[in-house]
Amino acid sequence: MHRRSTLFLEPSRRAGFILGFCLCPVLGTWAQTNAAPGQAPSNAPAPMHHHAQPEAGDCAGTDLKCATAVTPAFDAHNNLWVAWVAGGAVSVARSTDLGRTFTDATIIGRYGELIDVGADAKPQLAIDAQGRAVVAYGVFKDKAYDAQVWIARSASIWAKEGPGFGAPRSLSSDPASQRFPVLAFTSNGRLFAAWLDKRTVALARKQGRAQAGAALAYAWSDDAGATFSGETIAQDDTCECCRLALAFDARRQPVMVFRAIYDEHERDPAVIVLSSDGKPALQRRVAEDHWVIDGCPHHGPSVAVTADGALHAAWFTQGNARQGLFYARSENHGQNFSDPIPIGIAARQPGRPSLLASGNNLWLAWKEFDGTHIYIKERHSSDAGRHWTNERIVAETDHAADHPVLIAHDGAVFLSWTTRDQGYRLIQLEAT
């Protein structure tokens, strides 16, 4: 007999309470009705300023201090860029001192309550070696939580007049719902984007068939996001409300871990590898957790690839086989994974994993909550996940907090984290 979980979650608002943030009042409503909604960004060069500490309950504006979700990226000039959602707007800013100070924000677009601020709905930010940048995020289209993925592009974030992001436009040409984009540049400059897509679900409905979840869709760009081609459905039966995790292998092939739907009701982690011709080369179940759930977990996985070719996955589950946060590795490119290893203190609700590989060094960060404090913990492996250090606390707060994000630059590894009381922080991690 399967143990069945039931979650009664509204994908945007209620998920924010699980996230740990107060869901702040937002500014305005949909401001424009043309094909590229959103306020035109300010492209004037901006002065640097200190990132002020937010006051308790001060979360109504669009500033970084009010952010509910922050995504970092480094450029080739050693600048740190962050994209975030706050006050119903998507914004970006630059730091030249590892996050201690930031320029004034460039607002990509304002959407009011339509912006997707669900627990797994971080804005995406990718920057190539030439200083071209792309931001992607989701915006709801209706009360049924159908959404559209918007992208905004800068031809040069180093331009004297400012980063110059153009008007946002739809990533996909299909009118069906799309959510939870991920995007990244390969080492040779191609831009890969993937998202959860409802076009096959809509088609099944028209044909009188029921189809659970969403499809995993992807496309490529050879001009840094100016255009995308090869829009493809990789597979159906994907959990429609959990983020995708993306990495590239040594052959620059996309490796994604996501929550797949098995036997109509089980939602367990899966891996898919896309071959050089753009077609799925492999799809496997990472672990048989047998999480039977009538609802949306809003809790996506993480993935990394070490220099030895091993694939690494971390995920949260409440399955019949196991419950909590787990890690596993594959030495045969995803054909099989090791037995899942539990991560963190089970009584403290460990979750929200972030994996990062640098050579054969591997880091894993996650979030725990003891009823009063939120902790970010990490472990490190110097041999591609075969052996790990003991866990240690990197940061903590007793206020609302974003999920941890690990990022590497110039040989160093950092934890990117924002909290309501301490603001944005970039914390360097030392291999122990």
What is each residue range found by the language model?
Residues 14-15, 154:
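Hydrophobic alpha-helical segments, especially transmembrane helices
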Residues 15-29:
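Bacterial N-terminal signal peptides
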Residues 34-432:
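Extracellular, repeat-based ectodomains that mediate carbohydrate processing or recognition
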Residues 2-3, 31-34:
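N-terminal acidic, proline/glycine-rich, low-complexity intrinsically disordered segments
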Residues 1-11:
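N-terminal secretory signal peptides that target proteins for export/translocation
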Residues 10, 22, 37-38:
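Intrinsically disordered and other compositionally biased segments
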